[in-house]
């Protein structure tokens, strides 16, 4: 390969152009850019020339004419080097203040150590570690450079041997990498044994004895000094045979201790033991018999010297049994309580409660939450009258809001909220498109609605809010949310298709929400339209039209031509007038989150419908675990609004995280209040989730064990909005049987991130499913590198079909048998060294070589195996048809009898499907 000019430039700290100029001076005219490469020999020659300024012997003759130019460049280089060194000195001052402070103190010692090492050439001498690993140009150093170097680094004398070693290393042709490694290593000085013992021991030794003063000064100021003096008494008795030469080492200096070589005992540098354990032990033993002065003296201002404290009396702990003996007859228990908390309340041991529940067939731990039934049963078991109190009412900010805003005196008429529901492809979105003069249906993937949408329409000077819900079976929870928020439900039924499963489900949702229902019979423009079929089908569900004596309005419409839509809107407004929908304007806002998502550049975004009050920009809100200040409000067309009044819809930005769809959003007075609500709800939900994972009944235990044997497909699900994520998750959880299931290890709203890829790579055979999102190029590259499969979809049933196919591959294949033929054994021949050969007559189909056979005797299967040989007379054949005789040898079976039947068959494997 060779070495690029740019690599040499990086190593030396020069630009590529400067190195190219130097190379051309040396005679390498082919080198013109930094991307050109040279051989290792040429690279070392260029490196030496830039460092020393001396041309190699080969090129020296050619370059005599360019000496003046070279001098100028060398001067420039030296100027640049001084600038680099100045920067180095500044960096050294900033990054190593500790080393700088300690340098002047240890200067003399270091010089002595270096001089002592000159006499011992065998020892290892290493270079000082520079701040930047850029090699210097070997030019004449100026005074300014020397001064800068002295300021930046501690003054350490470098011996002439070192310079000669460096030059010889370059002469030997060391590589650039090895040279830079040497320069990165720090200064290591191995201490030769020297008579410094007297100076060290003089410093360490202290006066022999001194009486301990028992005043405050002895306790606070001189305690450590006295203890050290006492310690030295004991140390005198011990004879130090080894480790006499102890040398202080500045541990704070920037040195690599791994580079210090300890070859023998002579050159060993002994580190002082800095631990305080022996001092602490001695202190305990010495001060054990002394009176406790500190306790008495700490509260006195004067006269603390001669006082002696009385020994404190031992406090006898109260027996715990006394509290257990208390008989509790009645108690209030919170609705959500853990087992150990319940045990504390009724003065029982947790183990006692666990055993009671185990006897009742419920396996629990002390951290599990107890439900109301379990609490009542335990109350009966322990003969305690238990009253269950809902302490979580404090977390119910909606209830607090409703109690504070009961005054309806200032209520005004509000905008009606209409939800359009029905079966998939019956024309719900097309109807809304005609009303709004828009083209939403064309924009939806697959022509089906997969999001909940809220839209404002004005009719006869009055506003109407419409909610469009998906009709696909996967979006049940979306339809349920739409029915809960709405005032009136329009159920769309196709005149040519009649009542379908989702039609029935929509009617049930509307009845559960106790809201008026209007039936819109769509697609009346089709020739196959049959409205009577629709009416009779709905009559079976107790939805009887007004003309048949019922109470439900039926309107025949066409979303394509617009027929009957005006009549439908008139009926909607009439129904709204009958309901007398009212709300207060001048109270804090209360709204319902219809849909939420995470948008790039905007953060968490929520589509809401205000039910009471007025939501304004700048209001502080809380919605479940999400909270924040409303920064932006947009309508369904993207236009910015200042506020949203009751019954109106809008999109808000500013929440801390993506809220759950269906959550109630409340406007609160302060950010602190919102944060506290969100934090408490989050902690409560988390604890309940953790409790769920540990609870299991004895009946469920066997199912859990069996689940361990089930093959699972781990998936990570990411979607554009919360509603779609719910739908995908619920659909995937339904895809299971006794053999396989889907294991959702992570799900979330937003794009596929690198963290998702990392999590998928950590799980075996995990795939990432994206709904209405696309991964970025970086994420795709990382997924390809780690072998993670990412699949994205726009239509939910395509996603479900693909996952079904993958699960089918995990299932054991379905093996089916194909009968080929049957033969009757007429004669059995024993052949030496081979075994039995059956002389057969083929009675049905054919006998084939390679096929499986089974031997049947009197209707009972005696053996299953393979055909080892098949002959007709003396010839080997592949197949013998019906009506012909043949000889059959069966592999591994020698118990054939005349009258047995040989049945030939093949096994066919088919991929199982859910």
Swiss-Prot record:
Subcellular localization(s) per the UniProt record: Cytoplasm
Annotated positions binding GTP: 422-429, 468-472, 522-525
Keyword Cytoplasm (UniProt): yes
Keyword Translocase part of the UniProt annotation: no
Any one Pfam family match given in the protein's UniProt record, by short name: IF2_N
Region (Disordered): 58-160
Region feature G2, mapped onto this chain: 447-451
Keywords: Cytoplasm, GTP-binding, Initiation factor, Nucleotide-binding, Protein biosynthesis
Annotated protein name in UniProt: Translation initiation factor IF-2
Taxonomic source organism: Campylobacter hominis (strain ATCC BAA-381 / DSM 21671 / CCUG 45161 / LMG 19568 / NCTC 13146 / CH001A)
Lineage: Bacteria, Pseudomonadati, Campylobacterota, Epsilonproteobacteria, Campylobacterales
Gene this chain is encoded by: infB
């Amino acid at each position: 390969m060779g070495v690029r000019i740019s690599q040499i430039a990086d190593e030396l700290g020069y630009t590529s152009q400067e190195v190219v100029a130097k190379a051309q001076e040396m005679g390498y005219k082919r080198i013109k850019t930094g991307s050109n490469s040279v051989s290792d020999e040429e690279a070392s020659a260029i490196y030496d020339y830039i460092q020393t300024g001396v041309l190699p012997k080969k090129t020296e003759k050619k370059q005599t004419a360019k000496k003046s130019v070279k001098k100028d460049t060398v001067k420039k280089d030296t100027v640049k080097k001084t600038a680099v060194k100045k920067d180095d000195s500044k960096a050294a001052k900033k990054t190593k203040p500790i080393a700088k402070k300690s340098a002047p103190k240890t200067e003399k010692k270091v010089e002595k150590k270096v001089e002592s090492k000159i006499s011992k050439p065998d020892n290892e001498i290493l270079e000082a570690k520079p701040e930047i690993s850029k090699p210097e140009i070997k030019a004449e150093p100026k005074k300014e450079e020397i001064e800068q170097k002295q300021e930046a680094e501690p003054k350490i004398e470098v011996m002439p041997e070192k310079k000669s070693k460096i030059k010889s290393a370059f002469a030997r042709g060391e590589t650039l990498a090895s040279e830079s490694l040497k320069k990165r290593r720090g200064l290591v000085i191995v201490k030769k044994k020297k008579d410094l013992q007297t100076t060290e021991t003089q410093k360490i030794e202290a006066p022999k004895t001194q009486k301990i003063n028992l005043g405050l000064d002895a306790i606070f100021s001189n305690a450590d000094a006295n203890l050290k003096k006492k310690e030295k008494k004991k140390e005198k008795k011990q004879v130090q045979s080894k480790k006499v030469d102890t040398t202080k080492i500045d541990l704070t200096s920037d040195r690599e201790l791994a580079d210090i070589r300890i070859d023998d005992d002579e050159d060993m540098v002994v580190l002082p033991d800095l631990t305080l354990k022996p001092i602490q032990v001695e202190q305990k033993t010495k001060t054990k018999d002394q009176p406790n002065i500190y306790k008495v003296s700490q509260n006195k201002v004067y006269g603390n010297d001669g006082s002696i404290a009385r020994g404190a009396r031992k406090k006898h702990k109260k027996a715990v049994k006394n509290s257990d003996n208390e008989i509790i007859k009645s108690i209030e228990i919170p609705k959500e309580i853990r087992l150990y908390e319940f045990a504390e309340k009724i003065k029982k041991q947790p183990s006692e409660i666990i055993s009671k529940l185990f006897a009742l067939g419920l396996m629990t731990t002390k951290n599990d939450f107890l439900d109301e039934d379990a609490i009542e049963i335990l109350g009966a078991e322990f003969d305690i009258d238990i009253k269950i109190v809902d302490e979580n009412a404090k977390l119910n900010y909606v209830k607090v809001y409703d109690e504070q805003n009961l005054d309806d005196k200032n209520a005004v008429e509000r905008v009606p909220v209409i939800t359009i529901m029905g079966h998939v492809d019956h024309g719900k979105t097309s109807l809304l498109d005609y009303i709004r003069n828009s083209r939403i249906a064309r924009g939806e993937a697959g022509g089906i609605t997969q999001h909940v949408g809220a839209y404002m329409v004005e009719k006869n000077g009055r506003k109407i809010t419409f909610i469009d819900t998906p009709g696909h079976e996967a979006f049940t929870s979306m339809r349920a949310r739409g029915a809960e928020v709405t005032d009136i439900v329009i159920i769309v039924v196709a005149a040519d298709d009649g009542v379908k499963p989702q039609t029935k489900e929509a009617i049930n949702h509307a009845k559960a929400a106790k809201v008026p229902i209007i039936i819109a019979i769509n697609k009346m423009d089709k020739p196959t339209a049959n409205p009577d079929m629709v009416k009779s089908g709905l009559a079976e569900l107790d939805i009887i039209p007004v003309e048949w004596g019922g109470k439900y309005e039926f309107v025949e419409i066409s979303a394509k031509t617009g027929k009957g839509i005006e009549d439908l809107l008139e009926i909607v407004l009439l129904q709204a007038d009958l309901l007398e929908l009212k709300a207060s304007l001048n109270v804090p806002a209360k709204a319902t989150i219809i849909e939420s998502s995470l948008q790039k550049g905007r953060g968490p975004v929520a589509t809401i419908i205000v039910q009471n009050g007025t939501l304004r920009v700048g209001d502080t809100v809380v919605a479940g675990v999400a909270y924040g200040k409303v920064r932006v409000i947009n309508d369904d067309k993207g236009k910015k609004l200042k506020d949203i009044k009751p019954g109106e819809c809008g999109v808000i930005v500013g929440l801390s995280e993506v809220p759950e769809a269906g959550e109630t959003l409340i406007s609160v007075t302060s950010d602190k209040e919102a944060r506290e609500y969100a934090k408490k709800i989050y902690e409560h939900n988390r604890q309940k989730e953790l409790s769920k994972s540990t609870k299991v009944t004895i009946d469920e235990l066997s199912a859990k064990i069996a689940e361990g044997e089930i093959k699972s497909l781990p998936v990570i699900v990411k979607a554009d909005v919360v509603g779609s994520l719910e739908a995908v998750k619920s659909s995937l959880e339904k895809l299971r049987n006794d053999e396989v299931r889907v294991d959702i290890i992570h799900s979330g709203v937003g794009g596929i991130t690198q963290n998702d890829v990392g999590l998928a790579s950590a799980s075996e055979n995990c795939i990432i499913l994206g709904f209405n999102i696309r991964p970025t190029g970086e994420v795709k590259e990382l997924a390809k590198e780690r072998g993670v499969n990412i699949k994205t979809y726009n239509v939910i049933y395509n996603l479900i079909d693909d996952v079904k196919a993958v699960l089918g591959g995990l299932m054991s294949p379905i093996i089916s048998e194909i009968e080929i033929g049957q033969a009757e054994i007429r004669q059995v021949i024993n052949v030496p060294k081979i075994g039995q050969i059956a002389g057969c007559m083929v009675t049905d189909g054919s006998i084939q070589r390679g096929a499986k056979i089974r031997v049947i005797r009197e209707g009972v299967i005696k053996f299953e195996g393979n055909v080892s040989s098949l002959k007709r007379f003396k010839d080997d054949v592949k197949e013998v048809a019906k009506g012909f005789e043949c000889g059959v040898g069966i592999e591994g079976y020698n118990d054939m009898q005349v009258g047995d039947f040989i049945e030939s068959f093949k096994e066919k494997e088919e991929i199982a499907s859910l």
